[in-house]
Amino acid sequence: MRKITVLSMITLDGVMQAPGGPEEDLSGGFEYGGWSAPFNDEESGKVMQKLMQPSDLLLGRRTFKIWEDYWPKHTNYWPSINTVTKYVLSTTTTKSDWENTVFVNGIEAIRQIKNSDGSDLQVWGSSEVIQLLLKNDLIDELWLFIHPLTLGKGKKLFVGGAIPASFTLKESVVTPKGLIMANFSRAGDVKTGTSGG
């Protein structure tokens, strides 16, 4: 069985929309595209390089379209990006010239991929895919890149529908610019109790 890891850049108020650039995702009138750029530094770059090791990818259609134009020309930064399998959840797009791309449709297809043999899966961006995974308890790990700002609007990582779940902090890094990079692993059901005394 493959592990599914979600990697998401988020703000303090949970916004994950268009961290990479002004034109990345303008849906809903979003005007803060590129909000993560001021927080990039050497420390965050080291963590990102570690995470860009060969691993198959599970992407939504919008993220895939952005990546399809960009990453094949930037393999110096992510050498394995062309050779790993890119599973794309889409009901409208069904073909691509980008090598090793497989289009899938629906949660059952994702379950089959997760239960098959192969490398672990990473989910970058892809807010709709993440919501589907959260609702169906298919996320094994979260890598959250928590940026010290609020935006007030935009697509959020947790919008409702996630099942109650516990996570354990496995690793964390805080950069000089205040970016918190935290790796959480699924740890069973939510436990409750009484605080204090």
Predicted segments with their positions:
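Portal/gating segments that form or line small-molecule/metal binding sites
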Residues: 1-138, 148-197
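Short, conserved catalytic or interaction motifs in soluble domains
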Residues: 141
